[in-house]
Amino acid sequence: LLFARHITGAEDVYEFVSSTPSTRTYVVTLILFRDNLCVNCSVMPPSVSMGVFSNDNNAMIPGNSTGGYWNIALSTVQALSLNALPNCIQNVPNLSYSGGFYPFTITLPNNNNGYTITYQTCCRIENISNTTDLMGATYIGQIPGNNTLGTNLQDNSPQFSRGISVV
């Protein structure tokens, strides 16, 4: 019996590719973080379904699969190293995480308020203490629109260094 309680978090990042007078093209990547020490847990999903929504009117931007979602295949899985531990940690935890990368290219019409990119999963890791149940998680990313970007068409999301932070 396998459980999907292996996903510990996620990031949505985007990189600007090109633009026309009325559109911008981005490579959007969902990065899922997996606890490799989870017992009886499934592997990284082979694909994910994501939603893309206009912040101007909440309309879904039609994707490549049934229901209008974007079905994105797993591109690569990378082991994540442990970042430097603070001196205050005496009992070093045993940690092993990997990142699953799900990139896709999307061309979006220019709009005023940008776009929201979403991914939902059914389950959370075991023993999480800041929520009352383990019934799922939603991860979102925001691509800004003209009200924020103005004439700066070459906008990329911030990207954090890869690794496991203990504290």
Q: Language-model segments: what does each one mean?
A:
Residues 3-167:
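Long, compositionally biased, intrinsically disordered segments
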